[in-house]
């Protein structure tokens, strides 16, 4: 049976949601972040050399990286569900947003988190300098980039109910975490379509089932 090596408050929540949407049986092995470093525990390195989550094992197969995991699950268990037909405009949108989630949306969000943490982890004497540098990077670079990406997402959802058309797809599953992360840090602002989309996915029975099985998740 497929096993999800699940880290609390992490991208792996999306994998649980996808499996619930598809009705695929799975096991969960829970891992907890270190309370100080917020990093994954070393036990995960026994599953994959990088020791990060998400990672799944399915028989003798181990798959890491959320996008690769989503592709694997859709191909192995989807039976044509949650993916638009090949050659359609919806399929191109699906491919774009599936990769946008980690390729474009997440990096500035992670950098925002890191620059916010740096002043807490350096000597008090130079902490004001750390705050100044972090604030400048956030104001001049990261903040505008995140806003531009959220505006793009809002514009896309003005075209249709979901990111790849009128039906939920795995692209929406991938996009859930960056939108949730952005919302938790600075809110979605005056972006009604994006806000409505987030509320709608959170209300789905499969999403709620994944929350119950996954445990602590600060973004929903």
Residue ranges and their predicted role:
Residues 1-132:
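GST-like domain detector, emphasizing the conserved glutathione-binding G-site
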Residues 33-34, 171, 215-216:
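Conserved beta-strand edge residues that scaffold enzyme active sites
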Residues 101-200:
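GST-like fold's C-terminal all-alpha helical module
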Residues 68, 193, 206:
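Residue-level recognition of oxygen-bearing side chains
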Residues 74-78, 158, 202-203:
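Residues at helix-coil transition
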Residues 207-220:
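Terminal-tail/helix-coil boundary detector
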Residues 19, 56, 69, 153, ...:
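Residue-level signal for nonpolar/aromatic packing positions in well-ordered secondary structure
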């Amino acid at each position: 049976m497929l096993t999800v090596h699940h880290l609390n408050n992490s991208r792996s929540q999306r994998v649980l949601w996808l499996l619930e949407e598809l009705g695929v049986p799975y096991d969960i092995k829970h891992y907890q972040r270190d309370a100080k470093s917020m990093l994954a525990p070393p036990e995960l390195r026994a599953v994959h050399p990088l020791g990060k989550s998400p990672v799944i094992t399915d028989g003798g197969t181990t798959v890491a990286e959320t996008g690769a995991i989503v592709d694997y699950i859709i191909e192995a268990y989807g039976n044509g569900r949650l993916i638009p037909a090949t050659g359609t405009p919806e399929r191109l949108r699906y491919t774009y947003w599936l990769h946008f989630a980690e390729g474009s949306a997440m990096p500035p969000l992670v950098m925002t988190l890191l620059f916010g943490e740096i002043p807490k982890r350096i000597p008090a004497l130079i902490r004001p300098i750390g705050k100044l540098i972090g604030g400048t990077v956030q104001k001049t670079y990261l903040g505008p980039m995140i806003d531009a990406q959220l505006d793009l997402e809002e514009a896309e959802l003005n075209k249709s109910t979901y990111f790849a058309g009128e039906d939920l797809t795995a692209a929406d599953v991938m996009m859930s975490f960056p939108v949730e992360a952005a919302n938790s840090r600075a809110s979605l602002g005056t972006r009604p379509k994006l806000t409505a989309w987030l509320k709608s996915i959170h209300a789905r029975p499969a999403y709620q089932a994944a929350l119950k099985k996954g445990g602590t998740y600060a973004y929903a």
